[in-house]
Amino acid sequence: MGLSEDLHARARTLMQTLESALNTPGSRGIGTANPTIYDTAWVAMVSREIDGKQVFVFPETFTYIYEHQEADGSWSGDGSLIDSIVNTLACLLALKMHESNASKPDIPARARAAQHYLNDALQRWDIMETERVAYEMIVPCLLKQLDTFGVSFTFPHRDLLYNMYAGKLAKLNWEAIYAKNSSLLHCMEAFVGVCDFDRMPHLLRDGNFMATPSTTAAYLMKATKWDDRAENYLRHVIEVYAPHGRDVVPNLWPMTFFEIVWSLSSLYDNNLDFAQMDPECLDRIALKLREFLVAGKGVLGFVPGTTHDADMSSKTLMLLQVLNHPYSHDEFVTEFEAPTYFRCYSFERNASVTVNSNCLMSLLHAPDVNKYESQIVKIATYVADVWWTSAGVVKDKWNVSEWYSSMLSSQALVRLLFEHGKGNLKSISEELLSKVSIACFTMISRILQSQKPDGSWGCAEETSYALITLANVASLPTCDLIRDHLNQVIESAKAFLTSIFYARPAAKPEDRVWIDKVTYSVESFRDAYLVSALNVPIPRFDPASITTLPPISQTLPKELAKFFGRLDMFKPAPDWRKLTWGIEATLMGPELNRVPSLTFEKVEKGANGKWFEFLPYMTIAPSGLQGTPISSQGMLDVLVLIRALYNTDDYLDMTLIKATNKDLNDLKKKIRDLFANPTSFSTLNEVPDDRMPTHIEVIERFAHSLLNYPRIQLASDNDKNLLRSEIEHYFLAGIAQCEENILLRERGLDKERVGTSHYRWTHVIGADNVAGTIALVFAFCLLGHQINEERGSRDLVDVFPTPVLKYLFNDCVMHFGAFSRLANDLHSISRDFNEVNLNSIMFSEFTGPKSGTDTEKAREAALLELVKYERKETDDAFEYLVQQLTPHVGAKRARDYINIIRVTYLHTALYDDLGRLTRADISNANREVSKGANGVKKTNGLTTNGTKATANGSNGIHH
């Protein structure tokens, strides 16, 4: 047989196996998840009184965990720190309960080894990075129980963890929990000592709580009346898992419906031919699914009779539609629709992009998609916004793989575009279509940059997710420009997966990509996604059917890649990456045009010119080059600021060129008065249409717009005041620069400059006169807003929480400004002499008779040395700041700070590169002109390709 026949045969066998467990009389179901140490430890702690003695009911499970402790004292699970901590806490508790076991005299020593491991591991645990089900309840519960044995731990996030625990407990309605099934039944072991398990027997289903061995074990431990149903359930699960290794249990059993629905929906989504997959078997599955959906009145949970959830319900409804047993989505919509997205179930901590992607996919398969148009647009907006506001890849709370969210989002969003291309869903706005397009291309860009040399993206299941994503996003016409490279990547991935398909290796810890209390893998899912990835047509849809996206230039991405590819920093990057950044930048252009300017319309000029078409590339490419992606929203925020800075600065340069010293002194006073008034910038002052705005009005409009920017309003007053101060000093420094230029013109360039030393001018006026410092402070205001938004408190915290950190950051800003000023001067020497703008090499330190720099080349070499020095000082200052930050904000948040610094720094490095390139272009052009050739024409600071020849010399606007 060929690969296609083999794929369908594997899919057919999988469905027949799952269907047999579903419909065979007497079957209690099926589950192919790996066994877990955590759940096995809970079962090992179950005891009951027999003949007046307390006896452990499942001693064989304790033997298993006893024999599988690792050399460092831990039980590692998938190898992640959090799983090792949770597993080891549960096993340590089991060891303490079994200490009297005479047949295992080394239990105390083993317990000490576990304690030693936990003492170290808990110090390294950043709970803000953790995504596990109910960890904020489970870990405190285990710690409290260990306290009763005299075992306690102190670690940095202990207080925060217990505050989260107390906050969650305070919100619980125990009477409601005791009354009926809820999602909390899945983790009731976290409430030992709080919950009254005697009030819960009526919630058992087939002897278990939500198919969860750990909760069922906790119930047997704490209920005063023994329940044979629960004991029989646990014994049965141990028997089922005997082939996996003696006397263990998984985190979930049975998973019959979960495995059927997830596996079959994946096979359908990726174009498996159901006619080759035993249609009668599929029909029996559909009838059973419909039976339980009817019983649940249009919704159901992952096990019949358990809490309804949107994930299972949405996928089941979609399957019934394609299997010709349709059921209305009405009850589903009523149950799960929220104001801005669809919820998975009550009590969830946060919304899920994968759940909403599944809901969107399901509604797009409804017989009449337009009936649910408002819900479809709502979910699509939510999913697109998640991608729009996320830096890097989007991770989800149900799967550790960064590609799982990409797969489900791409399937739903591309299907949305396909339906819209058919003439449906007419209320979708052009803005939403644009964001969907950007989201999809963001996925493909990040996947292409992450493929490993063997063609994979990690384990086989993760690689399947990535390949399915590529298949869907390859349907976009924007991918035509990189189609050849895309095909190479896909062939490499298929070769990797084909070898796995035929070899069928045993599951490894790295295959545990699904998130529960600990991570786990599911054999049927691995098979289904593997078959799906190898079968999916690429592209999934004909690009010609995706016709309703806003059109973009087919030539601009190539222009961008070609031009910026000449820069030293981009030369090592392969052509396809440079072209990918060009496509992303081209997609971002319309979004920038959609945002109102922060300046007056009369001041705004050239916003649609080549310079502004090039701007997005100059932010996207440096961040992509160094693997420090920023969100599309963050990208747009930066671009809006750069555009406003450019236009404001350019307007002031043009209109102040003939200003007198008196004019400049008057303007300085107005600036100081404006910024000294605490009520300034609280309201927006308009300018009559019949006149141009004055200089102070332009400055006031810029400052007002920036300080009232919507996405910094939750930044603290201290953070916004720092931004206010940077804006004031920037404009005052610009005036000081103008005053220096007047002196130069009056005195002449051949006269030695006297007054402020070059060092002091560089670190005060020069550093203040760099717009990059405003961009850096503004970026941290954006982060401060995000931090406070996530905290959800009216008590706004500073982005740098201590006096030391504030001082260090301001020191970084000063060094960064000095470096940028010197670098700008280095690349503007010729122009500054031509235009009579003050440049570093005009200071007496460079021009004096004893300076040792009596030639232009020597002066330039000296300035280059200073640039290198200030760059090192800036590097060292930022590095020290980051070192001091981590203990205060945690490793995860510290990475956000680092990314801001890196992206700002790389953006400056790009202008450094651009300056060198432009100097070479101008030099070559002059040589060609002297020979009578055309060369590269320079007009108004533009090369013939339309980009700025250098950064703005007089005010350093783009540093």
UniProtKB/Swiss-Prot annotation:
Coiled-coil residue windows: none
Ligand binding (Mg(2+) 3): 824
CC cofactor: Mg(2+)
Biochemical pathway: Secondary metabolite biosynthesis; terpenoid biosynthesis
Enzyme Commission number(s) of this protein: 5.5.1.-, 4.2.3.-
Binding site for Mg(2+) 1: 649, 653
Cofactor note as given: Binds 3 Mg(2+) ions per subunit.
Motif (DDXXD motif): 649-653
Region of interest: Disordered: 931-959
Ranges for region Class I diterpene synthase: 543-959
Binding positions (Mg(2+) 2): 649, 653
UniProt remark on domains: The class II DTC active site contains a DXDD motif from which the middle Asp acts as the catalytic acid in this protonation-initiated cyclization reaction, while the class I DTS active site contains a DDXXD motif that binds divalent magnesium cofactors required for the catalyzed allylic diphosphate ester ionization-initiated reaction, with the first Asp playing a particularly key role.
Family the UniProt entry places it in: Belongs to the terpene synthase family.
Name used for this protein in its record: Bifunctional premutilin synthase
Organism: Rhodocybe pseudopiperita
Organism taxonomic ancestry: Eukaryota, Fungi, Dikarya, Basidiomycota, Agaricomycotina
Gene: ple3
